[in-house]
A protein has these predicted regions:
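Short, Lys/Arg-enriched N-terminal segments with co-localized hydrophobic residues
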Residues: 2-7
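Bacterial N-terminal signal peptides that target proteins for export
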Residues: 9-22
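Hydrophobic h-region of N-terminal signal peptides that target proteins for export
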Residues: 26-34
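Transmembrane beta-strand segments that form the barrel wall of outer-membrane beta-barrel proteins
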Residues: 65-68, 156-168, 193-201, 226-238, ...
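Short helix-loop boundary/capping segments
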Residues: 255, 275-277, 297-299
Length: 330
């Protein structure tokens, strides 16, 4: 089962986010910074459109917390935040950490460690390291009051959709083109409600695809577990006329080039016709388990998975994806 849809945040996975941020951090001329408190920086980040913004500081380090909603590409947004933090001023003689959230769930941290005896007058993005480790400062940062909360805000996202198949000899391809706007609402930490409507533009697939109908209608809860592990549970109506539940998890090892993931779904067939919902009685168990490797020299991701499909068949899948700044090819 392949539930790729609007509940995946801005079409960007956690692993892709880390790689794109890492790439952008090495593409900046030096910026000057002077030591200030974090209040002015927080205010400036809020004015830029970032959500869930806060800061804290102790004798060990200064920590900023943000969630990107101002920029379409996650890596570009985080790069802009790093620029601003450097411009507003880094702490003197102590590290600075930027923790990035998604729906209030911490994802990654960017860490700047000043060298002993070195001046902070010239600091660039390349001086920040990126990791899934959040550091000890997160224990304090998670309790601070954040500005510009994302809770109960409604995001509107429009997804174009192109489907094609080769089933008949008299036609090379049958094609479906849809435009599918969706709303996404953050209900509490990690919880998201997604509602989508599909508007057909062109259809060769038959009567069922000609109707304006609901797309993804889901409730999803994401949590971050200890040791760089993420888990998401979703229930609702998915793609491929499937409805039911889905659970996925991903763990990054200490060497963050390596990760493992697993997914299990329990769904039945259901569809809308004239806005009435019809469903069958057969439920199907699907799933996958796999391992991943990221090659930073070439910004390339490799993954190998074993999968169980809707008809009860088993198979293996290998992917190789090269990531660029604004696109991925694989």
């Amino acid at each position: 089962m392949n539930h790729k849809g609007p509940y995946m945040r801005k079409n960007i996975t956690i692993g892709t986010t880390l790689r794109r941020i890492s790439l952008i951090l090495f593409c900046l001329l030096p910026l000057k910074g002077i030591c200030q408190t974090g209040e002015a920086t927080v205010d400036a980040l809020v004015k830029m459109g970032f959500e869930n913004v806060g800061w804290t500081e102790d004798t060990e380090e200064r920590v900023f917390v943000i969630q990107n909603s101002a920029y379409r590409l996650e890596g570009v947004g985080i790069g802009k935040a790093v620029d601003l933090i450097q411009k507003m001023g880094l702490p003197e003689n102590k590290p600075c950490r930027l923790i990035v959230l998604d729906n209030n769930v911490p994802q990654i941290s960017l860490y700047y460690q000043p060298m002993k005896g070195d001046s902070i007058a010239e600091v660039s993005r390349a001086d920040w390291s990126v990791s899934y480790d959040l550091g000890e400062g997160w224990k304090q940062a998670r309790r601070i009051k954040k500005q510009n909360s994302s809770l109960f805000k409604v995001d509107i996202v429009v997804y174009p959709e192109l489907l094609f198949r080769n089933y008949i000899l008299s036609k090379v391809y049958e094609i479906v083109v849809n435009v599918s706007p969706a709303i996404e609402v953050s209900l509490w930490k990690g919880m998201k409600l997604t509602g989508q409507v599909i508007f057909p533009i062109y259809n060769d697939y038959g009567q069922r695809y000609k109707q304006i109908r609901p797309g993804f209608v889901t409730l999803s809860q994401t949590v971050r577990l200890p040791q760089r592990t993420f888990m998401t549970a979703s229930v609702g109506f998915f793609n491929k006329f499937r409805w039911g539940g889905d659970l996925k998890a991903k763990h990054f090892f200490k060497d963050e080039r390596f990760s493992v993931d697993a997914r299990i779904g329990y769904t039945g067939r259901g569809y809308f016709e004239d806005w009435a919902f019809y469903h069958g009685t057969k439920w199907t168990l699907t799933g996958s388990i796999g391992a991943n490797f990221y090659w930073p020299k070439y910004n390339t991701q490799f993954s190998l998975k074993g999968e169980r499909y809707l008809e009860g068949e088993y198979g293996a899948r290998f992917d190789m994806i090269r990531h660029f700044r604004y696109a991925s090819i694989g």
